[in-house]
From Swiss-Prot:
The keyword tRNA processing applies. One of its GO terms (biological process) is tRNA processing. This is Exportin-T. It is found in: Nucleus; Cytoplasm. The gene is LOS1. Belongs to the exportin family. PANTHER family: EXPORTIN-T (PTHR15952:SF11), EXPORTIN-T/LOS1 (PTHR15952). Its main location: nucleus. SUPFAM superfamilies: ARM repeat. It comes from Kluyveromyces lactis (strain ATCC 8585 / CBS 2359 / DSM 70799 / NBRC 1267 / NRRL Y-1140 / WM37). Keywords: Cytoplasm, Nucleus, RNA-binding, Transport, tRNA processing, tRNA-binding. InterPro entries: ARM-like (IPR011989), ARM-type_fold (IPR016024), Exportin-1/Importin-b-like (IPR013598), Exportin-T_C (IPR045546), XPOT (IPR040017).
Length: 1063
């Protein structure tokens, strides 16, 4: 035993070395796993020198054993006896003169040491586990006298039948008994845990047995304890916890009796037990019952009077619990009301519940909601949400016509009592929406954000519900609030609330919560008032002198999202000028500055103002200081600044593209400084990280300006329409963008060894395509050549292939583009295969290295990169198919690489087979290749260049002899582990069937209907099937299915064929 204690002391020591601690832990773990663990640790528990930590560890071991040991096992009985003996010893060591032990867990004069709480909780867990495996018929009645034995052992038998005060009992024993009861409920009754069906069935059987045998006994003990523990707050809290936790699954009539409830109520008077009492009462009223019974229970409990009697000057935790209790009563009443509303027979129950809510409970709910502490307010949200939902069904007059809420409302005329409730609720919402006076918008960002997310957003939802129920009342509440606060000049919190309410008001109009006809929304009274408020706000005497981030950002969020309500003269000019002030984009506060840079562009992209070049020149001169790029590789925050700066470049591009004079010389004012910076970067003797990052940022800015110009020129719904772009883009703009393309290429040629520059060059170049259209092709040829001569990483290559796919899609009908790809296809494919080879080598090396460490790692990072690269590459091949350019693969320039392309499509490793998306893509490409040039001739009728390529002899035979073995090897080779029951494998099987059907179809002759003359069938029957010793009966069936079934039918046949063969 001394060795165990020594090991525990070392393991728990803060000064022992790691090696020594490891030895101690290993020793304890060895004992824990030994056959005689129960005996060893049972003996240790009885050792007088055992420490509390040691006893905790021993109890933990025995507790685990109690769950793991099989039923009727002799060790389980031995463990039971050890646990009882330990409990008996603890009670003897802690004994005193009964109920005088008031400091449970703390000791008191004349009392020997009481086990600490963590030990008592572990004792409770041990007995709960013994209960779980020994109690009741489900455990063959191994210990069905569990509760009776414990009651006798812990010295609380005097409480069994007593219904009076002054009863003597062992306080420590009662403490342990209640903890055991609570732990048992955690095992079998706690709904917070998700349990398996088998465990839940056992739990139900245990509860059923308890209900019959012992629950009444327990309820008597609890009641007796409540009568005798008013001076023992720890014990009182424990018994209240027991009552609250068991109430959900025991007969409520055992508890809900006048004397029992009255005794529970007494504990609301004592500060130390108010919290536990409130929690207990919450559980009681949450008991599932029929609506009429629940109403009767709530009426009998009369909890609101009790809550009022507790007063308001309470500890915050108690106040929160009282608010939660009040909310619980109100919520249950509203649920009763909701359940009865649609039943004519239960209308009286519904009305009675509603009357209690309106006249009794809701005033208290609103009082708690209006409390200064948000944590108290929050407790009432679930009732308000539920009750408003009920009121919508009864009274709603608003909501979008045709919406569910409008259709389902009974439209009962609202009475004064309910109208008064809504009015009071609206007033509380307005009161609580205001940011607390203790908050500072500069220093308390997190606190304010939490308030907005958890409190304000919910209050807004309540406001919106009021709007739907009674639009006129909502209109009066919110307009009064805005009227009183919009002209505020001193308190920023009041003005911020006004702006927030303006946003809410505008949203309610936009979402038509007022229920007006769609055509009348813009001319409705709310919309006209909103326009008036926006004008008032724009003419606010002190708003734009405020230096308050929350007010500043809220204002710009409002005017950008709801600028349609701004009806002042020269609206666009007014707003853009406001943006160009220290109140906005030039603010000294970075949060304001960066957010308004984004909102500036969002406003421009939404409204696309048609500005004259004179005003535009003036505006650009104002914001030009913000367009100066200063990259710093050491400052992470500057990257954030640059990301926001890109919004400014896009916004200026949109303004230039949308200018009313269609003049684009003004673009030079933005681009010339950028070009000058690029020249400095290019001429730098050393391309250090500063220079590289500066170059990257400038290229990104140029591309973003280009995107903005195109967005300004072309309507949003036509941005991808090349013909529309061609009509609106003038020659001078094309010349400027050709110059931009040249600048990008020159820069790229100097910096192509840097990955960030390659990314930026590709990004910027892609943004030039919509404007230059097919005039981009000569520049693209040079760009692609530089890329192919660069040391690309796999991810980059994937992105680059995506860029090539974009080019093919856009210019598939351009002869120059066709010739470009005719020249570049082979180099691109070779680059892909070179990278794949490198990744295979890295993957192999990585796997060997990790295997040597004893780990079986199949998928390495290199393998994943290879799969992603293959996916991009197969996507490029699919692009040639979908854009009718497959003849490219048959040209003189590319026919030599074609065998390698096809071999790659026909070769897979075991790991690649289970990459379903990649496999599906590759087989789909192969099927299309067979369909379009499987015979050696390009047969795609839409391919404009098909007539210009010669036939490739032997291609048909190649496809047959390589594809057919693949069709049978993938499903049946053991190393591929192909599971036809798996969804991914079934998809691959379906694709393989289409591959075989394609081979069969291209070899069909229109003049010869003899299936045996089909080259695909001949290879199967004469060469492949005999080679693999395929049964002749199946050969006939398989060939018949291939020849007579259509593609969909053969797909089903092939899947079933694989299924049958693998059985």
């Amino acid at each position: 035993m001394s060795h165990i204690q020594q090991a525990v002391d070392i393991a728990n020591s803060s000064t022992a070395g790691n090696d020594l601690k490891k030895q101690a832990l290993d020793f304890l773990q060895q004992l824990k796993s030994s056959e005689d663990a129960v005996q060893v640790f049972s003996q240790y528990l009885q050792d007088p020198v055992a420490s509390d930590v040691g006893r905790f560890f021993a109890l933990q071991v025995l507790s685990e054993q109690a769950l793991e040991l099989p039923a009727n096992h002799e060790k389980l009985y031995a463990l039971q006896q050890s646990a009882l003996q330990f409990l008996r010893t603890q009670l003897e060591n802690s004994s005193s003169d009964g109920a005088r032990v008031s400091g449970v867990g703390q000791g008191s004069k004349g009392v020997k040491s009481t086990p600490p709480e963590f030990v008592r909780n572990k004792v409770a867990e041990l007995f709960a586990h013994l209960f779980y495996n020994m109690y009741g018929e489900v455990n063959n009645n191994m210990w069905s006298s569990f509760f009776v034995d414990l009651i006798q052992l812990v010295g609380i038998a005097s409480l069994r039948d007593s219904k009076s005060t002054g009863v003597e009992f062992n306080a420590i024993g009662l403490d342990l008994f209640f903890r055991i009861c609570a732990s048992i409920n955690t095992e079998i009754g706690d709904q917070a845990f998700v349990r398996s069906k088998e465990v839940q069935l056992k739990n139900n059987e245990l509860k059923d047995y308890m209900r019959v045998q012992d629950v009444e006994l327990l309820s008597n003990i609890w009641f007796s304890a409540l009568l005798n523990c008013q001076q023992l707050p720890v014990l009182a809290s424990l018994v209240l916890q027991c009552v609250g936790s068991y109430i959900s699954w025991i007969d409520i009539n055992l508890i809900v009796q006048q004397s029992y409830i009255g005794t529970i109520y007494e504990y609301l008077k004592f500060p130390q037990t108010k919290l536990a009492c409130g929690q207990c009462l919450c559980e009681i009223i949450s008991k599932k019952m029929k609506p009429a019974d629940k109403l009767q229970l709530l009426s009998m409990l009369n909890l609101t009077d009790r809550v009022v009697a507790t007063g308001s000057a309470e500890d915050l935790d108690v106040l929160e619990q009282m608010a939660k209790l009040t909310n619980g009563v109100a919520l249950e009443l509203s649920m009763v009301m909701d359940q009865c509303n649609d039943s004519q027979e239960l209308q009286s129950v519904s009305s009675a519940a509603d009357e209690q809510i309106i006249n009794v409970v809701s005033p208290l709910v609103l009082k708690f909601m209006a409390h200064e502490y948000d944590s108290v307010t929050q407790q009432c949200f679930s009732f308000v949400t539920n009750y408003l939902a009920v009121m919508k069904k009864l009274f709603a007059l608003g909501g979008k016509p045709g919406s569910a809420v409008a259709v389902n409302s009974k439209r009962i005329p609202i009475d004064p009592a309910h109208l008064n409730f809504l009015k009071s609720l609206g007033t509380v919402c307005v009161l609580k929406m205001k940011i607390d006076d203790s908050c500072d918008s500069i220093d308390d960002n997190e606190e304010i954000d939490e308030f907005v997310e958890n409190i304000r957003s919910k209050l807004k939802t309540f406001q919106d519900s009021i709007a739907v129920i009674n639009p006129e009342l909502y209109f009066d509440i919110i307009s009064d609030n805005i009227e009183q606060s919009i002209t505020e000049q001193q308190d920023w919190r009041v003005l911020e609330l006004a702006i927030y309410q303006l946003h809410n008001f505008a949203e309610s109009i936009r979402n038509n919560l007022f229920g007006v006809n769609k055509t009348e929304i813009s001319t409705s009274k709310p919309a006209q008032l909103m326009e008036k408020y926006m004008t008032t706000l724009l003419n606010h005497p002190t708003l734009f002198q405020m230096n308050n981030p929350l007010v500043q950002i809220s204002f710009f969020e409002l005017v950008v999202r709801h600028n349609n309500f701004i009806q002042v003269e020269n609206k666009d000019l007014t707003l853009l000028n406001i943006f160009c002030t220290p109140f906005s984009m030039f603010s000294g506060n970075e949060r304001v500055r960066l957010r308004t840079w984004y909102l500036f562009t969002r406003l421009i992209k939404t409204s696309k103002p048609k500005l004259s070049t004179d005003f535009l020149s003036m505006l650009l001169s104002k914001i030009s200081p913000l367009l100066s790029i200063k990259a710093s590789p050491l400052a992470q925050e500057l990257d954030t600044i640059f990301d926001s700066q890109l919004y400014l470049f896009e916004g200026t591009g949109v303004l230039i593209g949308a200018n009313v004079n269609n003049e684009y010389e003004i673009l030079d004012g933005v681009l010339t400084p950028l070009f000058a910076d690029l020249e400095q970067c290019i001429s730098a003797q050393v391309k250090n990280p500063q220079v590289v990052l500066q170059t990257h940022h400038i290229l990104m800015a140029i591309g973003t300006v280009a995107r903005g110009v195109h967005s300004g020129l072309v309507p949003d719904n036509q941005v991808n329409n090349a013909k529309v772009s061609e009509r609106v883009i003038c020659k001078s703009l094309i010349e400027k963008f050709s110059n931009i393309a040249e600048v990008i290429l020159v820069t790229f040629s100097y910096f192509n060894k840097f990955e960030t520059i390659r990314d930026a060059a590709r990004f910027s170049f892609s943004r030039l395509i919509p404007i230059l259209n097919n005039q981009i092709i000569p520049f693209a040829s040079r760009l692609i050549s530089i890329f192919l001569n660069s040391d690309l990483k796999p991810l980059e290559m994937g992105d680059f292939i995506g860029f090539l796919g974009q080019m093919i899609h856009m210019f598939k009908d351009d002869d120059n583009c066709y010739q470009l790809f005719n020249n570049l296809f082979t180099p691109v494919v070779e680059k892909v295969f070179t990278l794949e080879t490198q990744l295979e080598q890295e993957s192999s090396t990585s796997s060997e290295s990790k295997s040597s460490n004893g780990k079986n790692v199949i998928v390495t990072d290199s393998f994943r990169e290879k799969i992603n690269l293959k996916k991009s590459y197969y996507g490029l091949l699919a692009t040639f198919v979908s854009n009718n350019c497959t003849s490219l693969l048959l040209t003189e320039s590319n026919k030599n690489i074609l065998p390698r392309v096809l071999t790659d499509l026909l070769s897979y490793t075991a790991e690649e087979i289970h990459e379903t998306s990649t496999m599906k893509l590759s087989i789909n490409v192969l099927v299309n290749f067979i369909n379009f040039f499987g015979t050696g001739i390009c047969t795609d009728p839409k391919d404009r260049n098909a007539i210009n390529v010669n036939k490739l002899d032997g291609l048909n035979e190649f496809f047959i002899t390589t594809s057919i073995p693949l069709l049978f090897e993938i499903p049946f080779k053991p190393e591929y582990e192909f599971n036809i029951q798996d969804g991914g494998c079934r998809v691959i099987a379906c694709d393989l069937s289409r591959l075989l059907k394609a081979l069969y179809n291209i070899n069909n002759s229109s003049t010869n209907n003899n299936i045996n003359e089909n080259a695909c069938v001949k290879y199967l029957t004469e060469i492949y099937f005999p080679q693999i010793q395929f049964p002749q009966s199946l050969v006939v069936e398989f060939i018949n299915a291939l020849g007579t079934l259509d593609a969909k039918q053969f797909e089903k046949y092939f899947v079933q064929f694989i299924t049958n063969m693998k059985q």
